[in-house]
């Protein structure tokens, strides 16, 4: 009998915690990644995550938080992770609707739209996003609160 992994959407702020060691919630983000690698958790994201990942690495390079070699390694590592990327076309309309309704960026809303469409929780490492919308969206979760056994 095969075990079906639980599914969640992650945003780029969660994924970038796998690279940086100086951010809040890195232990839980690391556990989330371990659960994914070990097959207990299926990670989903809009394909936008790849661009935000690259932009986050670029910003870290400019701020001298990471070295060039670390950025290259991290850029390559993203494609090795078992993240189910969803194309823009799957969520474009719902993304615009959620951005308008919640007055959030189209980028942030893409992750929310995918989670709503899939009917799964969305984990974020962005405290401002979480604080602004967690009361309205009961499926939006702060990565620092991640525990596999708490997922529906």
Give the residues covered by each predicted segment.
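Acidic, PIN/NYN-like endoribonuclease modules and their adjacent C-terminal/linker elements
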Residues: 1-7, 112-152
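Active-site neighborhoods of divalent-metal-dependent phosphate/nucleic-acid chemistry enzymes
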Residues: 3, 83-123
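Alpha-helix capping/helix-boundary segments
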Residues: 14-15, 49, 91, 111, ...
């Amino acid at each position: 009998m095969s075990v079906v992994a639980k599914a969640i959407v992650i945003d780029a702020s969660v994924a970038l915690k796998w690279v940086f060691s100086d951010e809040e919630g890195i232990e839980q983000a690391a556990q989330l990644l371990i659960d994914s690698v070990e097959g207990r958790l299926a990670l989903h994201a809009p394909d936008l995550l790849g661009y935000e990942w690259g932009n986050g690495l670029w910003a870290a390079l400019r701020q001298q938080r990471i070295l060039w070699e670390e950025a290259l390694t991290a850029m390559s590592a993203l494609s090795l992770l078992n993240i189910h990327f969803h194309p823009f076309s799957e969520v474009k309309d719902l993304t615009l609707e959620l951005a308008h309704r919640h007055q959030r960026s189209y980028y942030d809303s893409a992750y929310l739209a995918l989670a709503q469409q899939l009917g799964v929780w969305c984990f974020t490492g962005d405290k401002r996003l979480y604080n602004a919308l967690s009361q309205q969206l009961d499926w939006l979760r702060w990565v620092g609160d991640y525990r596999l056994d708490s997922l529906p």
